[in-house]
C-alpha cells in the first residue's frame, strides 16, 4: 500500500500511511525488543485509542504519549511503525500513521519554527483527527523538537528554540484534550536533551537498550537463515553474539555485519548462500578495528 500524500503546505510531516499494510507487519514481528516492552506499548496504544475519551482527565491524566528512549540503531523508529501496524490489526480497523520529524520544519529563525510547530498541533493534526479513525503520530528524534530548556543556553540555542519547545508542550496538551483518537509515539536517542516537562507528560517512557547476547543471537539467526538456510550452524551463533555484545553493537549494526561479510569476497557477493559464521566473525573484527580508529566524539 503506497504512502498517502502529505497535504500541500504542511510542514513537519514527512509521510503518512494507512495501516495495516502487509509490508509493515515485519516491523513488529521481526524487531527484536523485549517481549514485555512490546506487550506494554501495544496495550497502552489500544487503551489510549479506545478508552481515553471515557476517562476523567484529572483523575487519570492521560496525554496519549509514549516515549521510546535509547541509543541509535536499537529499533525505536521501526518499533513505532510496527506498533501502529499491529494496533490496526488488533483493532480490526484502519489506523492513520503520521510521521513528524523536527528536521522537516523550516529554519529556526525569526520565530518561523515556533509558528510551524504551533500550526502542526493546532491545525494540521486536529484536521487529520477529524477523520474520526485512530491516529498514531510519530515524533521522531523528539530531542530536536522539545529541546530541554534547562540544558540549552541562549548562546548556542536561539530564543526561538525555547519558544518552539513551549509550542510543543502546549500542542501536546491541546491534542490530548481535543483529540482522544490521537496517540503520540516519540523517539529519542538522548533523553537528557528532551525537556523535562515533555517527559513528565509521557504516559510511558520505555528504555530500548542495546541488545543482550540472547537478542543478538536472535537477530543473527533472523538475518542469516533466509540467506544460508540449512547451512547455518546454530551452535556457532552464541560466541559470535557474545563478541557483538562485547563490541557494544546496536541491533542495526549487527544486521549490517552480514552485509559487510557478503561484501568481503566476490564469491559471497555472487553466491550469498556460501556465507558462513566465520565470515561474519571476520566482518566483526574488521568493524571493531574501524570503529576503534574513529575518535569517540565524531561517532
Model-found features: residue ranges?
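Substrate-gripping "pore-loop 1 plus following alpha2 helix"
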Residues: 116-120, 150-177
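Conserved P-loop NTPase "ATPase switch" module shared by AAA+ and STAND
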Residues: 129-153
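C-terminal alpha-helical "lid" subdomain
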Residues: 1-30, 213-299
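Structural recognition of the conserved hydrophobic beta-strand(s) that form the central parallel beta-sheet
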Residues: 138-139, 166-170, 181-188
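Pre-Walker A (pre-P-loop) alpha-helix and adjacent loop at the N terminus of AAA/AAA+ ATPase modules
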Residues: 23-64, 126
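A short helix-turn-beta junction within AAA+ P-loop NTPase domains corresponding to the substrate/partner-engaging
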Residues: 196-210
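Walker A/P-loop
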Residues: 62-98, 122-127
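Short glycine-rich substrate-engagement loop in P-loop NTPases that contacts/grips substrate
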Residues: 96-130
Amino acid at each position: 500500500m503506497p504512502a498517502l500524500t502529505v497535504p500541500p503546505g504542511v510542514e513537519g510531516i514527512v509521510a503518512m500511511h494507512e495501516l495495516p499494510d502487509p509490508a509493515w507487519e515485519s516491523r513488529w514481528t521481526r524487531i527484536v525488543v523485549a517481549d514485555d516492552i512490546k506487550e506494554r506499548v501495544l496495550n497502552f496504544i489500544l487503551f489510549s485509542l479506545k478508552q481515553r475519551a471515557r476517562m476523567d482527565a484529572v483523575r487519570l491524566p492521560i496525554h496519549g504519549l509514549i516515549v521510546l528512549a535509547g541509543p541509535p540503531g536499537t529499533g525505536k523508529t521501526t518499533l513505532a511503525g510496527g506498533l501502529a501496524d499491529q494496533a490496526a490489526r488488533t483493532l480490526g480497523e484502519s489506523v492513520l500513521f503520521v510521521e513528524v520529524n523536527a528536521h522537516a520544519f523550516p529554519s529556526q529563525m525569526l520565530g518561523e519554527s515556533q509558528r510551524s510547530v504551533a500550526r502542526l498541533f493546532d491545525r494540521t493534526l486536529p484536521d487529520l483527527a477529524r477523520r474520526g479513525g485512530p491516529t498514531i503520530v510519530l515524533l521522531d528524534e523528539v530531542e530536536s523538537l522539545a529541546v530541554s530548556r534547562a540544558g540549552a543556553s541562549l548562546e548556542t540555542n536561539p530564543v526561538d528554540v525555547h519558544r518552539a519547545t513551549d509550542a510543543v508542550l502546549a500542542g501536546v496538551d491541546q491534542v490530548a484534550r481535543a483529540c482522544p483518537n490521537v496517540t503520540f509515539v516519540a523517539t529519542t536517542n538522548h533523553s537528557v536533551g528532551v525537556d523535562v516537562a515533555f517527559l513528565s507528560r509521557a504516559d510511558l517512557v520505555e528504555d530500548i537498550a542495546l541488545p543482550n547476547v540472547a537478542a543478538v543471537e536472535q537477530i543473527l539467526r533472523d538475518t542469516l537463515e533466509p540467506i544460508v538456510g540449512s547451512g547455518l550452524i546454530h551452535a556457532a551463533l552464541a560466541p559470535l553474539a557474545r563478541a557483538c555484545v562485547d563490541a557494544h553493537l546496536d541491533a542495526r549494526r549487527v544486521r549490517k555485519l552480514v552485509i559487510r561479510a557478503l561484501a568481503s569476497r566476490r564469491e559471497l557477493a555472487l553466491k550469498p548462500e556460501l556465507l558462513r559464521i566465520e565470515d561474519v566473525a571476520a566482518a566483526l573484527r574488521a568493524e571493531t578495528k574501524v570503529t576503534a580508529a574513529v575518535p569517540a566524539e565524531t561517532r
